[in-house]
Amino acid sequence: MREALKQAEIAFSKNEVPVGAVIVDRENQKIISKSYNNTEEKNNALYHAEIIAINEACRIISSKNLSDYDIYVTLEPCAMCAAAIAHSRLKRLFYGASDSKHGAVESNLRYFNSKACFHRPEIYSGIFAEDSALLMKGFFKKIRD
């Protein structure tokens, strides 16, 4: 999760919503991909940290099946990212801060509990939640000032 926080800090420095994601091989605990939100620079709403990390991981291992991998994200995934996590079959999801507005894991939609979801990862929340929340608060304060 520390590396995901570093990625979120990079996003913050680039005036992107500070979310970072890291995908880790469960067998050897090595990071295979890492990313941060990049929607502003790419001018594309799909460039969330999770989507970029999943795309890169699939490219690296030449497979759409990430069942031997875990994802660490600084913020509770939105519906789009939760669906991508399910479709790529990531084994475990670790996330930091809850997202009361757009979170789709435990805060609002609860995508993984829906009938539309065919794969439910193990979910662990609250990992470095305070650090993640402080980054988010700092970012939105910065853009309001």
Swiss-Prot record:
Reactions catalysed: adenosine(34) in tRNA + H2O + H(+) = inosine(34) in tRNA + NH4(+)
Documented EC number(s): 3.5.4.33
Disulfide-bond pairs as recorded: none
Entry keyword Zinc: yes
Keyword annotations of the record: Hydrolase, Metal-binding, tRNA processing, Zinc
The protein's enzyme class: hydrolase
Comment on bound cofactor: Binds 1 zinc ion per subunit.
Entries under InterPro entries matching the protein: APOBEC/CMP_deaminase_Zn-bd (IPR016192), CMP_dCMP_dom (IPR002125), Cytidine_deaminase-like (IPR016193), tRNA_aden_deaminase (IPR028883)
GO biological process: tRNA wobble adenosine to inosine editing
Family note: Belongs to the cytidine and deoxycytidylate deaminase family.
Protein's UniProt name: tRNA-specific adenosine deaminase
Organism of provenance: Rickettsia bellii (strain RML369-C)
